[in-house]
């Protein structure tokens, strides 16, 4: 639960009576409690680092890249290679890794590359193999027995009341015995 600090003149407006809260509020603190630990001084009064503080060999302002140093087109944060060809995926990853300064900058990118590209030539070969297999399997003739719906001329049989039978259901006639 959040802590509430005293705001003096504004305190009355936020009391539970005026806010019409149904639950009592958490009691407020008059002063902030002290934290554990201590602050380590690393600079003198002029803002210069003390001699005991280790200095970075890199740029003292960090690796921030300003707007004018960024490329015109910024790659996306998440790239999926699943629906791409191998050549397209290779050119996309090459474009992402083309600017190493942008990848190393503190405000730079860490694009997430997901999936594996597919090769359309291998897909065509797989389709041809599956087509030839289905043709070889379909050589044996399949005999379909005559369905009862084929003899619609005989009045002795009941008509189907199912709507998918191709006609609207009519009154049922009992079978003649």
Swiss-Prot record:
Major localization listed first in the record, in broad terms: cytoplasm
Annotated GO CC locations: apical plasma membrane; axonemal B tubule inner sheath; axonemal microtubule; ciliary basal body; cilium; cytosol; intracellular membrane-bounded organelle; plasma membrane
Comp. bias regions, Polar residues: 132-163
GO-annotated biological processes: cilium organization; flagellated sperm motility
Basic and acidic residues bias spans: 115-124
Expression (tissue specificity): Expressed in airway epithelial cells.
Residue ranges that the Swiss-Prot or TrEMBL entry lists as coiled coil: none
Localisation: Cytoplasm, Cytoskeleton, Cilium basal body; Cell projection, Cilium; Apical cell membrane; Cytoplasm, Cytoskeleton, Cilium axoneme
InterPro entries (UniProt xref): Fltp
Region (Disordered): 113-177
Cross-referenced PANTHER family: PROTEIN FLATTOP
Family as reported in the entry's similarity comment: Belongs to the Flattop family.
Name assigned to this protein: Protein Flattop
Organism listed in the record: Homo sapiens (Human)
Gene, per the UniProt record: CFAP126
